[in-house]
């Protein structure tokens, strides 16, 4: 963890993603060491002067402010950092809750120490994504405005947040349910995975809390199952562990977990974190609905509702400029439907053309709200992933391909449904490279995989 004092500018740390503002290392030191190990590299500043310099010089995505020593100073510093970061959006997490209210002011989330780096890492991921989503909405509105179309502002659904709690009625889990209701949320309890999925398919929820109890297997299985379903894919999930349990952030993320909490964490704080996840989900859902309305603009691909080749090229150029200005990565992926004798027959008989709208719709639902999907050619799709590296883009593309490969498409009366697979490639925009060239590299990698 790199330390930067207010009397001098911070030492350059190109890979730093997290700015930590703390007077000492009582909580910040161990937290930074842990975040460094799980991929959220940190730069620590002792005062607001150095923090403002760091925001300009480093590729910072989120900030953490220690409130345990001087809360008033921390609140003022957070407000100044957000203002200095504009028009970019800077998520700021507070470490400490001096008045016990959990109310954030300039903070996007407040957590009480001690906190495990895994918990922080997962929340940072969610906060950073939310910021990128808001920025992407603005960028997409600009792209459409150039073509005379107005993108209506998102309309967030009103009413109590709907939370599904899944697991045995253990005392600490029941306490969390009570705390959620005290926060104004409505909770629905499911004791088994079967009941949980019945509820998930029948009703809409803003977040799901999974009680691990004495074992994590069933809870992780539910989360993984949600990530394989296009309708449930984006619902945030919190894994509530019993005291003494642990799980690595990579494993948690791979299994579909959005956040972690343990029985050692006060129920009211865990409830506030669940509510924050649920609110973010509602906001993202509203943005997604607003973006989907653009399908009726006459600018999108008629069959799939996705971006056309030309519209995607224009937006990708704007996105590339924005990501460069924000010191964020930008990656692209190409998905090309794989050829096979069976698919050739389906193509010749017109069944593939009939499946294309469903395929395009599935791809559109399986990406994040901030990602852009286009149909470049009859059987070629492209995706743009802001604030994502090449590996993240590749993994996302492979997940999309895996879900669609499990889908049965109609081949006509009395015939066995057919399936499709993709040749895929991903590329991260390199310094000085155009977005179009990066897309060509991704396409070449997809072609190479087909040839192999």
Predicted segments with their positions:
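A short glycine-enriched loop-to-beta-strand structural element that forms part of the catalytic core
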Residues: 375, 380, 384-386, 412-443
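Conserved phosphotransfer microenvironments
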Residues: 48, 61-88, 92, 96-99, ...
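C-terminal output helix
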Residues: 115-124, 128, 265-274, 278
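Amphipathic HAMP/coiled-coil signal-transducing linker helices
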Residues: 289-308
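Conserved helix-loop-beta segment at the catalytic/binding core of cyclic-nucleotide signaling proteins
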Residues: 299, 360-393, 402, 406-409
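Conserved long alpha-helical elements within nucleotide-processing catalytic cores of c-di-GMP signaling
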Residues: 308-320, 324-331, 338-364, 374-378, ...
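Non-catalytic signal-transmission and effector/linker regions of two-component phosphorelay proteins
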Residues: 1-34, 38-43, 49, 56, ...
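Alpha4 helix (beta4-alpha4-beta5 surface) of REC/receiver domains from two-component response regulators
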Residues: 73-76, 94-111, 118, 221, ...
């Amino acid at each position: 963890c790199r330390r930067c004092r207010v009397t001098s500018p911070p030492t350059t740390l190109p890979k730093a993603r997290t700015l930590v503002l703390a007077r000492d290392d009582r909580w910040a030191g161990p937290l930074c060491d842990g975040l460094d190990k799980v991929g959220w590299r940190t730069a620590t500043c002792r005062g607001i002067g150095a923090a403002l310099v760091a925001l300009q010089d480093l590729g910072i995505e989120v900030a953490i402010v220690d409130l345990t020593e001087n809360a008033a100073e921390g609140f003022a510093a957070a407000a100044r950092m957000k203002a200095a970061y504009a028009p970019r959006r800077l998520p700021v997490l507070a470490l400490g809750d001096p008045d016990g209210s959990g109310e954030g002011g300039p903070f996007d989330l407040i957590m009480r120490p001690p906190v495990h780096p895994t918990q922080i890492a997962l929340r940072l991921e969610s906060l950073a994504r939310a910021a990128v989503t808001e920025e992407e909405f603005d960028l997409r509105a600009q792209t459409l405005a150039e073509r005379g179309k107005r993108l209506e502002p998102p309309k967030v659904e009103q009413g109590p947040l709907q939370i599904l709690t899944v697991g045995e009625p253990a005392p600490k889990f029941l306490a969390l349910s009570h705390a959620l209701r005290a926060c104004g949320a409505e909770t629905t309890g499911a004791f088994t995975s079967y009941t949980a999925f019945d509820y998930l398919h029948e009703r809409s929820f803003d977040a799901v809390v999974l009680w691990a109890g004495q074992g994590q297997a069933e809870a992780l299985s539910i989360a993984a199952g949600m990530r394989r379903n296009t309708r449930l894919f984006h619902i945030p999930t919190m894994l509530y562990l019993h005291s003494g349990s642990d799980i690595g952030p990579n494993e948690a993320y791979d299994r579909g977990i959005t956040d972690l909490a343990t029985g050692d964490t006060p129920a009211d704080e865990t409830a506030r974190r669940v509510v924050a996840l649920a609110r973010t989900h509602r906001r993202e859902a509203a943005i997604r609905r607003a973006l989907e309305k653009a399908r009726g603009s006459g600018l999108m691909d008629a069959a799939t509702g996705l971006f056309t080749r030309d519209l995607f090229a224009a937006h990708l150029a704007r996105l590339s400029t924005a990501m460069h200005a924000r010191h964020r990565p930008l990656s692209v992926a190409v998905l090309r439907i794989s050829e096979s004798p069976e698919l050739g027959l389906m193509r010749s008989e017109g069944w593939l053309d009939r499946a294309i709208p469903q395929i395009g719709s599935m791809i559109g639902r399986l990406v994040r709200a901030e990602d852009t999907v286009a149909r470049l050619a009859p059987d070629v799709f492209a995706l743009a992933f802001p604030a994502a590296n090449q590996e993240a883009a590749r993994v996302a593309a492979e997940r999309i391909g895996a879900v669609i490969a499990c889908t049965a498409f109609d081949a006509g009366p009395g015939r066995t449904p057919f399936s499709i697979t993709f040749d895929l490639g991903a590329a991260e925009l390199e310094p000085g490279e155009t977005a179009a060239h990066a897309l060509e590299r991704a396409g070449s990698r997809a072609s190479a995989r087909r040839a192999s």
